[in-house]
From Swiss-Prot:
The keyword Iron-sulfur does not apply. PANTHER family: VITELLOGENIN-RELATED. Residues 1088-1127, 1148-1169 have a biased composition (Low complexity). This is Vitellogenin-2. It comes from the Eukaryota. Residues 24-663 form the Vitellogenin domain. Residues 1417-1593 form the VWFD domain. Residues 1081-1174 are annotated as: Disordered. InterPro entries: Lipid_transp_b-sht_shell, Lipovitellin_superhlx_dom, Vitellinogen_b-sht_N, Vitellinogen_b-sht_shell, Vitellinogen_b-sht_shell_sf, Vitellinogen_open_b-sht, Vitellinogen_open_b-sht_sub1, Vitellogenin/Apolipophorin. One of its GO terms (molecular function) is lipid transporter activity. Pfam families: Vit_b-sht_shell (PF09175), Vit_open_b-sht (PF09172), Vitellogenin_N (PF01347), VWD (PF00094).
Length: 1687
């Protein structure tokens, strides 16, 4: 019994241990049938697809424990390109034969429990073929768990290690085991792929990918297995891989790749499978092995037999095809050359260079192609050629820049770039060294993006450079090194950078501010990898309020680049509530405000945090003017398409000046789930404005500075600010990397000026002129590999899949120039000789460009390609032949365009999407199928004359669009391809014999789905053709200009007018109209209808050759006349083509009643603002009228128009009495020598001050022309009449400009009136009117619905004051007005006009003066009230008889000092100005202001006074005296009996000090004392700027001095008895003097212990540096009386 129980137990345990893992029994061979294929294209049927199929028998047998052999039998490789599913796969017989040796070779693999381990193969099997074996073996990879039926795990496969989901189901009835394995390709921990191109420049946008995807894929495998005791047998396995890709979100349609594999069990052979007798070496695991995929471009498949010979052939083809003209296929040939160079060995490239380096064209193409190789081989070649000196500096710069961006970053490339930087040829050229160094940083960054754990040793050489430069205090070297570290963005660089930042490095304070800013900006890229580390540093910089505001604002830019969390943004907001610097406050607030509206996904959390922060802050911060720093950010993101763009701009100022100190701007693009900083630039200027405007000829006099400093010596602890050194810097970033920068200082500017004025530039100019005279020709071509973006990854079949974008271009130009000069120039000629010569030049220029762009998705292996390819080919060529002649002495200029034969298409653009299948053994049999099948259609054309384009262009476009109406698209069946869109638009100018046509042909897949990707896929073309127009042959187009007396000789068509005949014709028309119209109508009405009728008939003159067109024209004319007549009956307003303004005066009495009634009806709804403009308008008084006596005002109100009419009627055309002063001919020279074109003649009559311009058509019997008559009726009025049409009678406008007065202020009024205008001008005017209305409302311009004259526009501009205008614009339906429109400059009127007399004859100085005056900062003192430069008002009690510093230059230059003294007896202010080497005193005396220069009084009769240098002027203004010295920083100092006014120029802002403040806009830091401490009250601040007396015998009678006062009582501070002294000294009488007047002031007191030895005799400097412990009230003396015995 026990034996039976034991047997049952053993059997039960054995039954539970059945293995589900596949097992292959030793000694047997398992035969399977394998088939796998890949198809790519759009998912819909009826479109073309491309694919590859692999079929074979598969034999598997055991080779040992856990070791197996796999062998293929009868493999077949097929390709597919055709309409799916109609076409079939076509076997690639030659390719199969070529690969059969490798495919039939068995491979070994480890296999245990369903998991494949290592793979072994002989060396003869290439990596590409072995990957195919891996794709097959992947079908047998399975991790089966006995205890679970549903589970997830990270499984190794061909594509790497990805998340895999298992479902196991056992069918006990059928004795089958069903397994489903699904692999999510979007969640791989170790994905096998290769990225080429933009990988180092883009940033992944995780938030964007959460909203949509551009690439998605999954693999599903179904197994049917038969379980057994020894293991399961795989009966069938089916795998399906689906991959979708779209650059604009796969939800909106995508190109897909579908791969399917099937393995079907066939039989078990009893014989074992034997391996080859060869060395089986380990070849990796089941993971796909990347090999030569980078070398193979998917655009074309090359069969390479002799790479050197093929390179030579390709190079010769490129050179020959692009000799001065870019061939259409050149970009593709260029890509072919690059592919061949990638395959070639380094020695072969060296041999090619040696062969072609002396041939300029071949050399040029080689140097442009080698960087595109994309490996360190290119860098090695470039380095060796630079070291050997075989390339020029320009060639080296081009090669370095190209290779930096195109070469794939690896350790070898980084070492080569590092070594290149230290080569002598590079170190000696500063520009090349900068390029190499910046490129080194870019290379490190690209490497670290692909290898996040890159070592810090990569950037250690730059760290060493920083250490050495810091020891030498070499700011330029530090700036370069910081930009390199900024490009690299390695976290290990944080410590070296921090050493250069104030507050972190001990030596940082000795460095220039620009170094601090560069160091801060270098943190930006590090912050994208380590945001927390950078946030700590940048926040500390911002919080340190002792640092320069510019540095703090740059730190904020760095902070926001790290995508701040809510907590930090709230911290910033709380800090701003107590921020004393308004520049910083304005910048941060505006940056936060801008981010509240962001729509980009990656900044959504920042936007939410900024919305909270803005609520914390006060909205009044937004009211700060644009003189304060600002940050701007605008963006837009379209979620459905995953497309977006963002732009940021930073305007950084430091003293509220007009010109900012720093400007930065950046543009970012979002595409396909990544973002890239496309372009960034910055410009920084410090002291540039000052360097341009301040006096340059002021001698650096030691005596002057000594005198200035002596006056300020008494100021307690006064500290001079450092003078600004003129410095400018520029930088440019492309794709987020610094590529170029420049620091511009005085030395560089001097070098540029020296070069521009030196003999070398003259020598070069002479050589260029000699080359032109001897004949110059050049044929130039330049290839560019602009974009190569590739994403390579394996498919489940083991074939490489590629998504790529290529752009290549070739530009070319052919130039031939021949010049002649008569008479010939002497050898030592001066450039002025050219102005006296007759210069002729012939030139032929042919610029051309060819651009190819390819987008590829599909299989790309060295032996077979099957892909969907979109290729765009753009080509443009614009050949020109021209001749020019210039004779300045004779005033003659001509320019001729000569026809170019054989050129029709000047521009073309084609885009097609095709399915391609080809293999390397059968390239001739490659099959290319359009994805959208082609279906021919007859095109419909619409040809237009250029003269009709403005009327009919829109109609023609819409008509041609009807070829494929929208409804037809919707009605098209699912499988029926709609007809293509075909359009042809032409414009013809018969005058010059040119016809231009645009042909459009388009067919796409939007009939299936209307999304962007479907719209792109198809065939599209656009052609721009220029051909000779039908008609007479044109030899050339010529432009001639003749000035002077010979202008009459160039007149080809005399313009005459038979006035009697014209008048007679008008009378006949009037008689006919008189019978039709009512008797009440006046003659002017008849004239208007007549004009309208003649206008209509003249419009059809061009078709008058045929009787039908003539009759239709007559009918149109008749109907037009009748319509005009009927409309005139309804409207009593009168028209006259002669002069609309004159008619207005004729009918003024008759229209007065209607205008008054209309104004009364509208007055009930008028507002107060309306009353303002009406008053402003009615007060306009003409200066022209004031020339006449008052008694004749009514008579002369029409004198201007009447005089114009009388002169015009007397002499219609000035050609009858004067010769033209200028003649311009723009004509086509016909073969039959008939005139064709236009003639412009300008006449001037001095007697009547009349200018007439006549534009006439040169065609015989064509009377169309434009006539413009301008006449100066007086010094205050100018009138212009412009008429055009046949005989200048169809259309009429009149413009009158006149000066006048509005409430005694100067004004200008311009009127535009018309009688009749063309339809297109009226339409355009309506659009302009709507635009003006919209813009006016947005800019605070008032608008009233007040009707004006129906055919008149009037603009009135009146002076409100020297800096503002009152503007009124009257239109027929609205009136716009703006009162007090502020100007950015002073008008040259009143006081400004008088001040400009000092610059008489120097208009540039006058303009500069008006601009600087408007930007000046102003300070005013009235009695004891001061209004500072920053517009802050305070009252002060001034010590008697003491001078105070009102304003001064606080730099070490001390360009000026303005002292103020209060005469307490007379209660008036006196000022003393120390400027340059003179002292100017101004003081009131006997109700007048007296001025002394160096102690000598200047009588008022001798004013204005001009200093000998010409930079200082003293003049009388109103009731006072003013001094002007803008080039010294003082715009104006003015003193009257009751007011003192000081104005400093804009570039002095932030550099002044004194009672008026710093003029820096910082009102929160207004009370700045001489030692730069901010006082707590105005009194202490004012007293700090008083100059104390030296002794009680001082002539100034200021018997006081500053003292630090000890607190009279002892206090307990922090538990210790202390004595306190004032840190803000107060005024006390000198020893021996007693106070007679005092005041109380609040002072801050630092305290020391009672044991301290500090007493009054000790130096007070240590006290002034201490912080304030307590505040107390102290007594300050204002007036003292001294005893005779005082010292």
């Amino acid at each position: 019994m026990r034996v039976l129980v034991l047997a049952l137990t053993v059997a039960l345990v054995a039954g539970n241990q059945v293995s589900y893992a596949p097992e292959f029994a030793p000694g047997k061979t398992y035969e399977y049938k394998y088939e796998g294929y890949i198809l790519g294209g759009l998912p819909e049927e009826g479109l073309a697809k491309a694919g590859v199929k692999i079929q074979s028998k598969v034999l598997i047998g055991a080779a040992g424990p856990d070791s197996y052999i796999l062998k293929l039998e009868d493999p077949v490789i097929s390709g597919y390109s055709g309409i799916w599913p109609k076409e079939v796969f076509h076997p690639a017989t030659k390719l199969t034969s070529a690969l059969s040796a490798q495919l039939l070779t068995p491979v070994k693999f480890e296999y245990a429990n369903g998991v494949i381990g290592k793979v072994f193969a002989p060396p003869g099997i290439s990596t590409n073929v072995l990957n195919v074996f891996r794709g097959l073996l992947n079908m047998f990879q399975m991790n089966i768990k006995k205890t679970q039926n549903v589970y997830d795990l990270q499984e190794t496969g061909v594509k790497g290690v990805c998340k895999t989901h298992y479902i196991l189901h056992e069918d006990s009835k059928a004795d089958r085991l069903h397994l489903t394995k699904t692999t999510d390709l979007n969640h791989c921990t170790d994905s096998i792929h290769m990225d080429v191109g933009m990988a180092g420049y883009t940033e992944k946008c995780a938030e964007c990918m959460a909203r949509g995807k551009t690439l998605s894929g999954a693999i599903s495998v179904n197994y049917i297995m038969k379980p057994s005791a020894s293991g399961t047998l795989i009966l069938e396995a089916t795998a399906t891989e689906l991959l979708q890709y779209s650059p604009v979100n796969i939800v909106n349609g995508a190109v897909q790749m579908e791969a399917k594999q099937t393995v079907t069990f066939v039989d078990i052979r009893k014989t074992p499978l034997e391996p080859l007798k060869a060395d089986y070496i380990p070849r990796g695991s089941l993971k796909y092995e990347l090999g030569t995929e980078f070398l193979q471009t998917p655009i074309q498949l090359l069969r390479i037999t002799n790479v050197e010979a093929q390179i030579v052939e390709s190079l010769n083809n490129l050179v020959s095809l692009n000799m001065g003209h870019a061939h259409e296929d050149s970009p593709l040939k260029f890509i072919e050359l690059i592919q061949l160079l990638r395959v070639a060995k380094y020695e072969s490239i060296e041999a090619l260079w040696s062969q072609f380096k002396t041939k300029i064209d071949h050399r040029h193409w080689l140097l442009s192609s080698i960087p595109a190789i994309g490996t360190h081989v290119a860098l090695k070649f470039i380095k060796e050629k630079i070291v050997a000196g075989e390339v020029t500096a320009a060639e080296a710069a081009q090669a370095i820049m190209s290779s930096t961006h195109l070469v794939k970053a690896d350790l070898e490339a980084i070492k080569l770039q590092e070594g290149l930087a230290v080569t002598p040829n590079i170190r000696e050229n500063a520009g090349l060294r900068e390029l190499v160094m910046l490129g080194f940083g870019i290379m490190v960054h690209k490497y670290c993006v692909e290898n996040p754990s890159c070592p810090s040793e990569l950037v250690r050489p730059v760290h060493d450079i920083i250490a050495k430069a810091l020891e030498k205090r070499d700011n330029d070297e530090l700036s370069l090194a910081l930009k390199v570290l900024g490009n690299a963005g390695h976290p290990s660089s944080l410590k070296p950078i921090m050493k250069l930042l104030p507050g972190f490095g001990s030596s940082a304070s000795e460095l220039e501010l620009r170094v601090h800013i560069d160091a801060t900006l270098a943190l930006r890229k590090i912050g994208k990898r380590e945001p927390k580390m950078i946030q700590d540093v940048a926040l500390q910089l911002f919080m340190d309020r002792t640092l320069d505001p510019e540095l703090r604002m740059v730190a904020v830019v760095v902070l926001f680049d790290t995508k701040l969390p809510m907590g930090l943004i709230t911290t910033l907001a709380q800090s701003l509530l107590k921020e004393p610097n308004l520049q910083v406050l304005s910048f941060v607030y505006s940056y936060m405000k801008a981010f509240t509206k962001t729509t980009t996904p990656d900044h959504s959390t920042v936007a939410a945090a900024c919305n909270v922060a803005i609520r914390i802050l006060s909205p009044r911060f937004e009211r700060l003017s644009y003189r304060y720093s600002r940050a701007f950010h605008y963006d837009h993101y379209h979620n459905p398409w995953m497309l977006g763009a963002a732009a940021s701009a930073f305007y950084i100022n430091d003293a509220a000046t007009v010109l900012p100190k720093n400007i930065m701007a950046k543009a970012r693009v979002y595409l396909s789930g990544v973002s890239v900083d496309v372009l960034e630039f910055g410009a920084r200027a410090e002291g540039v404005q000052e360097a341009l405007l301040k006096a340059r000829d002021v001698p650096e006099s030691a005596d002057r500075l000594t005198k200035m400093k002596q006056a300020l010596k008494a100021l307690t602890e006064w500290r001079a600010n450092p003078s600004r050194q003129p410095l400018g810097s520029l930088y440019v970033k492309v794709l987020g990397q610094d590529v170029a920068f420049a620091n511009i200082d005085k030395e560089m500017v001097e070098k540029i000026i020296e070069f521009a004025t030196g003999p070398e530039i003259r020598t070069r100019g002479k050589k260029a002129l000699d080359a032109l005279l001897s004949g110059y020709s050049m044929k130039y071509s330049k290839p560019m590999s602009a974009i190569e973006v590739r994403h390579i990854f394996p498919t489940s079949l083991g074939l490489p899949m590629e998504l790529s974008l290529y752009t290549a271009a070739v530009t070319a130009a052919s130039v031939e120039v021949q010049a002649t000069i008569s008479p010939p120039l002497p050898e030592d000629f001066h450039p002025a000789h050219l102005l006296k010569s007759d210069i002729s030049m012939k030139a032929s220029v042919t610029p051309s460009v060819s651009l190819h762009t390819y987008g590829v998705m599909g299989v790309n292996s060295p032996f077979i390609q099957a892909s969907v390819l979109s290729r765009a080919k753009d080509h443009a060529a614009l050949p020109k032949k021209m001749e020019a002649r210039l004779d300045i002495v004779k005033g003659y200029f001509s320019y001729q365009f000569l026809p170019v034969e054989g050129v029709k298409t000047i521009a073309s653009a084609r885009l097609e999407t095709v399915a391609i299948a080809r293999d390397v053994e059968g390239l001739a049999a490659a099959k290319v199928t359009p994805v959208v099948p082609y279906e021919p259609i007859v095109s419909k054309n619409a040809t237009l004359n250029l003269s009709q384009m403005s009327y009919y262009l829109n109609d023609s476009i819409s008509a041609s669009s009807e070829l494929l109406p929208f409804s037809l698209q919707r009605q098209t069946g699912k499988n029926k391809i709609p007809k293509p869109i075909v359009k042809k638009m032409c414009a013809t100018t018969y005058t010059y014999g040119i016809e231009g046509c645009v042909d459009i042909w388009s067919r796409n897949a939007t009939f299936l789905r209307n999304t962007p990707i479907y719209a792109i896929i198809g065939n599209h073309s656009l052609l721009v053709n220029v051909t000779p127009a039908a008609g007479p042959s044109i030899e050339r187009i010529e432009i001639e200009v003749q000035f002077g007396e010979q202008a009459a000789e160039k007149i080809l068509k005399e313009v005459y007018l038979n006035e009697e005949e014209e008048v007679l014709e008008d009378k006949n028309v009037l008689m006919k109209l008189k019978k039709i119209l009512s008797p009440g109508l006046k003659n002017s009405t008849k004239a208007s209808s007549s004009s309208s009728g003649s206008s209509r008939s003249s419009r059809s003159r061009s078709s008058s050759s045929s009787s039908s067109s003539s009759s239709s024209s007559s009918s149109r004319s008749s109907s037009s006349s009748s319509r005009s007549s009927s409309s005139l009956r309804r409207n009593s307003k009168m028209l006259d083509l002669a002069d609309p303004l004159n008619i207005t005066s004729k009918r003024s009495s008759s229209s007065s009643s209607s205008s008054s009634s209309s104004s009364s009806s509208s007055s009930s709804s008028s507002s107060s603002s309306k009353t303002k403009w009406q008053l402003h308008e009615r007060n306009f008084t003409k200066d022209h009228i004031h020339q006449h006596s008052v008694s004749k005002e009514r008579l002369n109100s029409k004198s201007s128009a009447s005089s114009f009419e009388s002169i015009y009627n007397k002499i219609t055309y000035l050609s009858n009495i004067v010769s033209p002063v200028v003649t311009v001919l723009v004509r086509a020279i016909r073969a039959d020598h008939k005139n064709q074109g236009y003639q412009i003649a300008v006449y001037y009559d001095k007697l009547t001050t009349r200018v007439q311009i006549i534009v006439a058509n040169l065609t015989e019997d064509d009377n169309w022309r434009i006539c413009s008559d301008s006449m100066m009726l007086s010094h205050h009025k100018v009138m212009t009449r412009v008429t055009w049409g046949i005989g200048c009678k169809q259309y009429n406008t009149t413009i009158v400009a006149e000066t006048g007065r509005v409430e005694k202020e100067p004004a200008v009024r311009v009127k535009l009136a018309w009688a009749r205008l063309p339809t297109y001008i009226r339409d355009y005017a309506r659009r302009v009117s709507r635009y003006i209305s919209r813009v006016a409302e947005d800019n605070g311009v008032n608008r009233t619905k007040v009707a004006s004259k129906p055919k008149e526009i009037k603009l009135t501009v009146a002076v409100a004051n020297e800096t503002s205008l009152n503007v009124t614009l009257n239109t027929p339906k609205n009136t716009f007005f703006k009162l007090g429109w502020v100007l950015p400059f002073y008008l040259p009127i009143n006081n400004t006009a008088a001040e400009l007399q000092a610059f008489q004859g120097r208009w540039m100085d006058q303009v500069t003066y008006m601009l600087t005056k408007s930007a000046a900062a102003e300070c005013t003192v009235v009695e004891d009230t001061v209004v500072t430069f920053n517009n802050r008002k305070y009252k002060t009690e001034t010590p008697h008889s003491c001078h105070q510093v009102l304003a001064q230059d606080c730099t070490s230059e001390i360009k000026f000092i303005v002292l103020l003294k209060r005469d307490q007896t007379a209660e008036r202010n006196e000022i003393s100005i120390k400027i340059e080497n003179i002292d100017v005193d101004m003081y009131p005396k006997d109700n007048a202001v007296v001025v002394k220069v160096n102690g000598v009084e200047i009588p008022l009769t001798n004013l204005p006074y001009q200093h000998p240098t010409g930079n200082i002027q003293i003049r009388q203004r109103e009731e006072g005296i003013s001094l002007h010295a803008p080039s010294h920083g003082l715009q104006e100092v003015f003193l009257s009996l009751n007011k003192v006014q000081v104005k400093v120029v804009d570039w002095m802002r932030g550099q002044t000090c004194g009672l008026c403040g710093k003029a820096d806009g910082e009102v929160r830091q207004e009370y700045s004392t001489p030692n730069e401490r901010v006082s707590r009250n105005a009194t202490s601040f004012a007293h700090s700027w008083v100059l104390p007396a030296k002794s009680c015998r001082d002539a100034s009678e200021c018997y006081m001095q500053l003292e630090s006062v000890k607190l009279e009582k002892q206090i307990s501070l922090e538990g210790e008895e202390s004595k306190c002294y004032s840190v803000e000294p107060v005024w006390r009488c000198l020893p021996g003097c007693a106070p007679v007047r005092t005041t109380s002031v609040t002072v801050g007191l630092p305290c020391v212990s009672l044991d301290s030895n500090l007493n009054r005799s000790d130096s007070l400097s240590s006290i002034y540096q201490k912080s304030v412990d307590v505040s107390e009230t102290a007594e300050s003396h204002l007036a003292c009386r001294c005893t005779p015995q005082c010292a």
